[in-house]
Amino acid sequence: MNHSRSHALFVQAQTRIPGGVNSPVRAFRSVGGEPFFVARADGPYLFDVDGHRYIDYVGSWGPMIVGHNHPAVREAVQVAISNGLSYGAPCAAEVTMAETIARLVPSCEMVRMVNSGTEATLSAIRLARGATGRNYIVKFEGCYHGHGDSFLVKGGSGMLTLGIPSSPGVPAELSKLTITLTYNDFDAATALFEEMGHHIAAVIVEPVIGNANCIPPQPGYLQHLRTLCTQYAVLLIFDEVMTGFRVALGGAQALYGVTPDLTTFGKIIGGGMPVGAYGGRRDLMQHIAPTGPIYQAGTLSGNPVAMAAGLAMLELIQAPDFYTHLSNAAAALCTGLQQAASQAGIAMTTQQIGGMFGLFFTDQQVETYAQATACNTDRFNRFFHAMLQRGVFFAPSAYEAGFISSAHSPNIIETTLEAARTAFQTIANEAAILSKSETPIKMR
């Protein structure tokens, strides 16, 4: 593929933008090479500035659940724009959005709009600390909750890719207030609560880890956290920035039947536009200004254009059997990829929850962060580039989940699998040649 225009843009970008990108994973540092620059997107496809088309399994990192540039979402945005871009004052759409979230996710009795998932999680832990009068926050290895200082402690996603346990610029004293546990370890959670449960303000968790690829909870694990939090009056926060409206209409909390005290959402509620929200029990949310003393604000919060896009998308995903079709498509993709890898003699495991999936280059199921980091990342990188050359775009990191949209038809899935069969066989052949070249010559 010729990527001359993308290359020129990347060179130019690096003179004005740190690393040439506005979010680290986009730079392809993990997989090698240079990123392509997108010109437009439609349905299941991305089109780059050099004229190449890609089947997209990143979906803007999750929110494009009905595909890119859906006519209903686009029309809603066009209508909203005709009335103005930003008001700095209340509008009807933000009320409708709050009502819609509360109806679809009953644990969110009240909702506050913000501008990103990071802003939502930062606001949620401030609320938790203010409401409980405690300072300690518990998170889990491999979970990523945005780039807030309290979360950059053994963070996942880009932090995993960069191999940095914390970030310069985060005060050591603040990091001490974040306790990190191993996800899916029942005993570790119990031991921590027995030791200092009465000092913990909140436990924040991705109910399905999406930032160390895709790691689901072990049976009963989320309920175990719920029980411990209730026993010690600790707030349980589900970070559903990735799983919200993605793994089920009511999010992971509906799928697993566990009710958190607070929930955070990200860009999916804006149909892909910059937006976030956090919600929860009424008694907790009333601590937020102006009804309470805990301050949080934002000029663009509840932006009318983002609300319009999000409401249109939320309407579409309530169609009958929407999630059944989404899950079936993801299952077909994962089963096909697993079979293609196996036929080529390549160890790979897939894990899938609803329309969210992960590819692990290992022969074992992955339950923890440590197991995710032990996978063969070099082989993933080879697979990533082999698929990209064949017009299929997976996340440019071995530690990121993939996403299916309703625009991924059976034909799109089969096209992907055809590319994968060729890619896996190519990788297997390369490995065989390398192995043969490294075989020592016997001396007589």
Curated annotation (Swiss-Prot):
PROSITE patterns: AA_TRANSFER_CLASS_3. This is Glutamate-1-semialdehyde 2,1-aminomutase. GO terms for cellular component: cytoplasm. The keyword Cytoplasm applies. The modification N6-(pyridoxal phosphate)lysine is found at residue 267. It catalyses: (S)-4-amino-5-oxopentanoate = 5-aminolevulinate. One of its GO terms (molecular function) is transaminase activity. It comes from Xylella fastidiosa (strain Temecula1 / ATCC 700964). Disulfide bonds: none annotated. Its EC number is 5.4.3.8. Belongs to the class-III pyridoxal-phosphate-dependent aminotransferase family. HemL subfamily. It is found in: Cytoplasm. It is an enzyme of class 5 (isomerase). Homodimer. The keyword Cell membrane does not apply. Its cofactor is pyridoxal 5'-phosphate.
